[in-house]
Amino acid sequence: MAASRNASTANTNNAASTAPLRISFAKIKEPLEVPNLLALQTESFDWLLGNDAWKARVESALESGQDVPTKSGLEEIFEEISPIEDFSGSMSLTFRDHRFEPPKNSIDECKDRDFTYAAPLFVTAEFTNNETGEIKSQTVFMGDFPLMTNKGTFVINGTERVVVSQLVRSPGVYFDSSIDKTSDKDIFSAKIIPSRGAWLEMEIDKRDMVGVRIDRKRKQSVTVLLKALGWTTEQILEEFGEYESMRATLEKDHTQGQDDALLDIYRKLRPGEPPTREAAQTLLENLYFNPKRYDLAKVGRYKVNKKLGADEPLDAGVLTTDDVIATIKYLVKLHAGETETVGESGREIVVETDDIDHFGNRRIRNVGELIQNQVRTGLARMERVVRERMTTQDVEAITPQTLINIRPVVASIKEFFGTSQLSQFMDQNNPLSGLTHKRRLNALGPGGLSRERAGFEVRDVHPSHYGRMCPIETPEGPNIGLIGSLASYGRINPFGFIETPYRKVVEGQVTDDVDYLTADEEDRFVIAQANAALGDDMRFAEARVLVRRRGGEVDYVPGDDVDYMDVSPRQMVSVATAMIPFLEHDDANRALMGANMMRQAVPLIKSESPLVGTGMEYRSAADAGDVVKAEKAGVVQEVSADYITTTNDDGTYITYRLAKFSRSNQGTSVNQKVIVAEGDRIIEGQVLADGPATENGEMALGKNLLVAFMPWEGHNYEDAIILSQRLVQDDVLSSIHIEEHEVDARDTKLGPEEITRDIPNVSEEVLADLDERGIIRIGAEVVAGDILVGKVTPKGETELTPEERLLRAIFGEKAREVRDTSLKVPHGEIGKVIGVRVFDREEGDELPPGVNQLVRVYVAQKRKITDGDKLAGRHGNKGVISKINPIEDMPFLEDGTPVDIILNPLAVPSRMNPGQVLEIHLGWLASRGWDVSGLAEEWAQRLQVIGADKVEPGTNVATPVFDGAREDELAGLLQHTIPNRDGERMVLPSGKARLFDGRSGEPFPEPISVGYMYILKLHHLVDDKLHARSTGPYSMITQQPLGGKAQFGGQRFGEMEVWALEAYGAAYALQELLTIKSDDVTGRVKVYEAIVKGENIPEPGIPESFKVLIKEMQSLCLNVEVLSSDGMSIEMRDTDEDVFRAAEELGIDLSRREPSSVEEV
């Protein structure tokens, strides 16, 4: 009863009633839903295109009185570049009104056929002849523009990619102080950093001289720059006379007047060129005052205005003399120790240095802006072409079409999507990894930091990250702290700064009004936590409230002094981190591993949502886009495995197609299953079909397994894991993996390759599963080395003997020289063929030049869990399976239930992640149900208020981060679980159970913690790592085997291993390893021969690497000779002839093209 009565409040998922029931322990009512988790990608791209969705958002924002940009991204660039004038200014070309035609191919066709999902872009171009006033207007095609899918991805050449948002230093003016090493004095410096163009840097050094650095060149006195800008010595003294530093600088400055100063600057910037006044003037103009060369961007102008108290309009993208004066003034005031001043606009401004790692000074460049910058470079290259063509072509014959060359624009867009560091192959391991990938914030990439140069400060957690970037989720390793994840409630404002929402507090009264604040706005306020106790009148219950102030300081203040309050306890963490139950009990380092490992979980054959969730499961799965959601409300009309048809309330029909066993980027299986029935009433946004790793529309990355924390015969030493055979035989942790194999038939110099069943020297049983085209049939079971697609390649014509010519004449072309280049299943792979795609040039398919046919074969394999696979919980508790026990050997509860998995209790205390222990207790409670509806204890009262006092067995529960089940609630509930049919409770109120040894039937001496934990199977599967080689490819130069599984390489017997054999005196073993097993080319062929013929192994020869060493020494002009034991010179082989001779005598076919380098593989 309680559960259903309270389903809507207890259901901490979305407000819509479509989410499955999940009883929540949350005590805090949140005034705000989690926003759309993909908005970061989609809204930015909408702005770039200027589509209807963006226009609607702008209108509603303007109505509500917000200041938002009213120009779309592409519109901005076309306006920026227009007009393109020729050198004399007699003709010009302008662009306006861009529009898109519908894309040529659908998303699925693009994935299938390796196309890019793009729409043709058209622009109206007007050519004006200024002398005659004649205007010619034309619509010009500007190339295909890649479009974003509704999931926030791009399909480029058939693969899904994500453009990651970049975290960069915002343009603006920055003041900094550092201590001089020699004199211990503070050195103050200022930098004006534009969005593009030359930096202007100033500093006051230890001698109190104010210097300026123009465009990273040598330092000069700042007064030289002021004089060059037209100021006289008197004006400088009048403005800056009260500051000792400026007076001293002026005295040291020997330039006389503007001309002298300009020439002085020119000499420093362009040493070796003859200085003239005009050239110097132009140089300075071009550096800082020419909008084509210098741009602060709106955000830079906004930051400069804010810092210096100026009132320039936001579209003033170049510096003004006033900006330079104000910067110098601010710097000398900072040096003089003043703390506040009045800006040009009359505003009071604080004089202080800036913190570069503060999120008020770092901004996000998201997809729209990154692509916009790329298009801008392309258009700038095109502009040069247009100018040249204007001068060379006949004025009468010119039309916009003849002037414009779209190649550079198309090339720069293609280059960005194909090769930029920020355009990444999408992580599609499971829906969460895709979602997190799209919400990633990356400080690397062009214009960002580099791994090597990034110090500790940039990587560290900063107080201004709160509610903006997750402090937990970041990679381990060299990128730690440089790659982050957007916090759950964060959003990006028009300037690119991350905003986070806060509830307004008015005179101690907490309201439901929400304000979004950027990091530097937030610094002015006093902010209370989300869990601050509130009375029924929405005022703070305690006299003093714990708050944060600027710079992360914590303080207690009266309720009336509080300005804002957090909207939600999970405000500071990202989506993945918010899915860790009892996060508040885990050490941050382990939580980081937990958040990262959830992204590596493999979708299982049957998904199961967690018994213990956090209420974030529904929203994350729904927004990730791997489930099918209803676009409109209506009724389900028809359901099958492949599609769902709905009749909508407005009279229209929609058919939703489902993906069946298609391959993700990571080779996991993407399969959607219907969860509605015909005749069901549906509402907009309801989940109609589950995707991979989702159940009933909730994220379901793993399985709920019965865990016991106990040592077992030492098999779970060092985080190893013991599993029950049940998980293997019932396919509890089995997953499906799909591999794609591709082969193409090309035109070669000797003739075309052919896909055929007619392969030389191959027996009929090998071809049994190939159809008449030579392509394997669907449903065939294949193992390593089986032929998937038969293909022959013409071999070079050799001189024929008369007998062969006779045979040719009699039997026709049959004996023609071809060699077998069929596509075979690679080593270590096995599975069932589930799909074949054939593309043929003759049937009109677009294929790359020189390719006549292309065949793709999809092989699926079911991987059961096995020893060596890696499992993990959600708390960073990971381990490798060491042993799979028979069910009858596993420890069992008093009612005979065997546990599924045994973990080592020693893995908990030192790792400081007891969240996993609380999870097993709550998991047990959820599986058994409880009833505390009549109790008077304080903890039970809390549960009665939120409707979590009576729960049926097997009900999913939610314990949201920082607002979940308390320890006293768990302890109390363990005493009131619903007993089994014998009236017994298997787990004692302590949370431990009496377990019995499955082998002897004896009880273990102590009670053992038992409960349900959510276990993930990670993508580190032992089948993908196992590898063995007999013969295979060799490196071109050293002739040694390649390394690594991908190259089918050998195991390196390294320096230290050699020492070990030397220590044992195993001379022959060592000699074999260094010669015939590695790079003695002749020797290894002869050994093959001896083994084939059953003879003794011959003497090893000279290793190839020795010859390489000698060649290297010869290249350094050292003549090295090799002498035998009797002092005779030994000839070194320079050709491979004798190898081929030996091989031919043996009948070993060396013509089979083994890849000879890593590149070729």
UniProtKB/Swiss-Prot annotation:
One of its GO terms (cellular component) is DNA-directed RNA polymerase complex. GO terms for biological process: DNA-templated transcription. It catalyses: RNA(n) + a ribonucleoside 5'-triphosphate = RNA(n+1) + diphosphate. GO terms for molecular function: DNA binding; DNA-directed RNA polymerase activity; ribonucleoside binding. Its EC number is 2.7.7.6. Keywords: DNA-directed RNA polymerase, Nucleotidyltransferase, Transcription, Transferase. The keyword Transferase applies. Coiled coil: none annotated. Signal peptide: none annotated. DNA-dependent RNA polymerase catalyzes the transcription of DNA into RNA using the four ribonucleoside triphosphates as substrates. The RNAP catalytic core consists of 2 alpha, 1 beta, 1 beta' and 1 omega subunit. When a sigma factor is associated with the core the holoenzyme is formed, which can initiate transcription. The RNAP complex including the principal sigma factor HrdB also interacts with RNA-binding protein RbpA. Belongs to the RNA polymerase beta chain family. PANTHER family: DNA-DIRECTED RNA POLYMERASE I SUBUNIT 2. This is DNA-directed RNA polymerase subunit beta. The lineage of its organism: Bacteria, Bacillati, Actinomycetota, Actinomycetes, Kitasatosporales.
